């Protein structure tokens, strides 16, 4: 079978517009209890059934009176009120607490702080004691102009009378009609609109609806989204993971997106790569679903049948979208099956098989489609300005979504790009946002200010510590302990090697650099290179741990390797670390000590960027040995041949060390919790953890 090509590739905005033009909003609605309505979309405007409040009530603790009875009261003339009703006394009052209904004859409330009991006179005004009543506290039912005046809450020397409600009280301030009273309908009047059509119901909307006498509300039905994975190679989570078999997780991610955006996901079992079976399963899915997502098979490979199958069932609106990652996406318009639950046109989305591509297409096509079907607007995506410290190339003709981490260094919010592979779903976990590069732009220049679309709250971005330099699994342990005391913190690591990390720190591109550079001349770690590379940058140098480096080999050490010198044996395949990495510096030091030419080692130029990548290369059988930390060998069940011990230090910019999160980090480094956590992992010594090193004065 010949290879296929993208049949109808379009820019993202055109594909989205075509999709929405063919999609029909759901025309039915359903009624749900208010208590179960959170997150649902209103089908029509919602009106109040009752006024709120439905009676005239006290907005303060105090006494209810007729306002006109207080006219003339002043600091020089206290007016006396008696407990009772107009039928029994001349100036009646009753005690009221906040929320109590007023007697029919009352039209004002005097705050309890303004009410006094005892002898009254217009001459000399002896201190009058406030009667015992509930303390007058503003509970939010009154406006800001009605708050008590703290300078005149009590007369000087007056003391509350405990255990007594006085039958006769005095006031020295005149009330206005309906002062400190919540009138009927103050919040909302029966028949007034509460919520508009197409409104997503929030927690305080639930409260307002119930307060206004509503017990049910008409909402749009959740769009039913059939999610159909394709691929003969797919297995379910928990099944044995054999080479060539792929765990099916994309459908779970898409289902979670659908739930978050107000739909009802229906995950279907994977279908093998067979066009007839695929068409049969699609037809069945469309009988009850409002739209369908077909995962994989959307590209131009020999066994990619999604596009041809959808074309045979309807119209391909787009086959290929000018985004990266995500180009193989498909948008199709399908007629409803004969036995369908409704006769509206169905939209089918062909999702790329790579998870990052699929996630981007979900955000750019599936979310607006669900919003359209629900008759509501998409939530605004929060964007933030950031600076690109280095040039970022991009492919012309495609809108590229570059995953980035963000961190504020000084007064600049800096972005750091993550690996761009479409299959690396963990980059989405680590990403703070997307940098979207337009199709007609070939890249971002160093120093450019750009807009980043956030994937997490801005507060978490402000708590991000940018860590560059050497890789070590204990950085994850450090982050975990740090989050105990600083929950909004996050370590965003960039494993570029010790040398490159120090240089990035010097350029102001990171808060902290991890390093383990051995100086061959002095036999000391890190200090000589720090003084040589960033002499003008004020820093603090703190040891994270002393760690053990050695050769990682397969279980049982099948080649009988004993040390570095054995790497030159015939048939031994080696994996090295990148140039500038401290581990590579350590290897070169030992090779020089042994008088070994690096060219004699098969794989000396085969480079990876982390200790875990070294361990994976050995564990998978790709190579026979690599130099790395003991903890990486232990994690993957490899044998370990010790070579050396080294100081693994953290170099903090002084301005960062003096910041709140920097101080928290230093406190964690000097604490017992971190030592205990590191001690639980083989290959580390913590006697010097948290110890600060001093540079020699130049």
What is each model feature region?
Residues 536-548, 638-667, 691:
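Periplasmic-binding protein-like
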Residues 180-294, 464-493:
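Phosphate-binding glycine-rich loops and their immediate beta-loop-alpha structural context
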Residues 406, 411, 417-509, 525-538, ...:
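N-terminal hydrophobic or amphipathic helices and topogenic motifs
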Residues 462-471, 565-590:
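Short loop->beta-strand "edge-of-pocket" segments that line small-molecule binding or catalytic clefts
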Residues 2-215, 384-385, 437, 449:
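Phosphate-interaction motifs
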